[in-house]
């Protein structure tokens, strides 16, 4: 009998959470990671990557890892430039990661590294503010998004 490395009651994937009032936690699979090579308002420009070949598409989620900011891809401008929902690249080089979007969200459990309040959108599309979540806490609620407004906790990781 063959045994899988995955167990049904444990998380198999984890992703750092950048809180947003509009963007769901993305699928925890990196499409591409690199550094931007130029700056233009509301764009990600990387002359070293071919976003078409990599399969980056509208709705994918971009993390500016350097600054801890987030945006979605609204369109491809060219093979090396993406139009974004927010101006998250104002200098170079900034490290970024692109993840598959999560429009019909998977449900994630959360780990909170540093204490505070956590404002979430549950998988049932209900907003909830969890008050005074302690350091190193797991939140046993299925969530699709961690909202920026109302969240004071940090070092949050989504588990799938």
Predicted regions and their residues:
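Surface-exposed interaction regions enriched in Ser/Thr/Asp/Glu
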Residues: 91-101, 147-159
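Short, surface-exposed beta-strand/strand-loop-strand elements in extracellular ectodomains
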Residues: 115-124, 155-159
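Beta-rich globular "head" domains
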Residues: 23-28, 50, 56, 102-114, ...
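Short, intrinsically disordered N-terminal pre-domain segments
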Residues: 1-22, 31-32, 155-160
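Beta-sandwich interaction modules
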Residues: 130-144
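Short, flexible beta-strand-to-coil junctions
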Residues: 65-66, 111-117, 148-151
């Amino acid at each position: 009998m063959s045994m899988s490395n995955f167990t049904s009651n444990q998380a198999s994937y984890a992703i750092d959470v950048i809180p947003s009032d509009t963007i769901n936690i993305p699928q925890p699979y990196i499409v591409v990671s690199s550094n931007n090579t130029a700056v233009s308002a509301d764009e990600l420009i990387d002359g070293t990557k071919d976003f078409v070949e990599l399969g980056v598409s509208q709705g994918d989620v971009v993390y500016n890892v350097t600054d801890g900011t987030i945006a979605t891809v609204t369109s491809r401008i060219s093979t090396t430039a993406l139009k974004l929902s927010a101006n998250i690249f104002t200098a170079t080089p900034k490290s970024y990661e692109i993840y598959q979007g999560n429009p019909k969200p998977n449900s994630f459990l959360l780990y909170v590294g540093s204490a505070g309040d956590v404002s979430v959108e549950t998988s049932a599309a209900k907003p909830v503010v969890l008050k005074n979540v302690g350091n190193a806490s797991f939140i046993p609620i299925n969530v699709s998004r961690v909202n920026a407004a109302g969240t004071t906790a940090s070092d949050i990781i989504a588990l799938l």
